[in-house]
Amino acid sequence: CAAISLAFFARRMLELAPKAEYADVMESALYNTTLAGMALDGKSFFYVNPLEVNPYACHKDSRLRHVKPVRQKWFGCACCPPNVARIVESVQEYAYTVAEDGGTLFTHLYMGGVAKAELNGTAVELDVTANLPWYGDGKAVVRLGNDAAGASAQAPARFTLAFRLPGWVGGESAAAAAITATGESESGADSSRVTREIRDGYLYLTGEWRDGDTVTFDFPMPVRMLAANPLVREDAGKVAFVRGPITFCAEEKDNGANLHLMHADTEALLADPSVAKVEEFDFHAGATGIDEQGQGEVEDVTRRMVKLEVPAWREPLPAAVAAAGEGAAEVPAFAPLYTAYAPVKREP
């Protein structure tokens, strides 16, 4: 619910001022924590979704009994399941908005579908094909319908299409260069019938649009290392690995026990970001993971990180008897389910 509320808030901020930084936050909240809160079959849920889970510690600490290592079928206070259903059903309201003057259609999230809007009196459809969040390519085809008077609007219509320049691309210029539109560089009398302007993280394409005009995009998706805010005590000195809008996490399922001992050689990663590479994983068709080369105390090791929704496809690790004497309850082995942040290696 907290992640969904963050998406609500970011959308309201977009209505006040169309700035890409708000859409970046909204996208991150929707694609990561919100989706990870529900299993793929929709039958089990997380009530809380912390960055790290230590099942053994949660079992022993009565204050953390509500933190579960696996999704639960239901809760006594079950506001989260219907909240997830509501936002998934209404995701189109987060992907597109129309400016108050009725002349601009904003694309905030790049997802496949058809957006319908009336722009300056003309019925417009934007037919979008996108491969995000795994790949940065796609296209949006303009379809013109009838105007406000009911007449055919096959003739060019003037309006603006504004496309968000995602922060994860690596700068507005790089993102804008990845977008091209029909009519921007035509020869003859129709030369540059569509013009571009970058403002507040959006690329505004304005001009005389024709039925069938196409906007193509192919955003680069480098693996990025993000430092946590040191004012959050538990996150000080930690980093997250992100590719596109997806935040990745490390699990004992792939990396063995004692995830808390993992260190990232931040200097090496900053010097050569290609060390963190993307590869397909075998546990589920289409799932994508990151191989992150961590610097151990003695030797380099390869650590695997998976997108936050991945635990929906996995069984919890085998249970172990707590070392508390005879009759102790069985609890899952010391096995954090999520570790979105890896500690940064620091010199003494």
Show the residue positions of the predicted features:
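Surface-exposed beta-strand/loop patches in extracellular or lumenal glycoproteins
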Residues: 156-169
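C-terminal beta-rich recognition modules with glycine/proline-rich loops and embedded aromatic residues
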Residues: 24-32, 37-137, 143, 150-154, ...
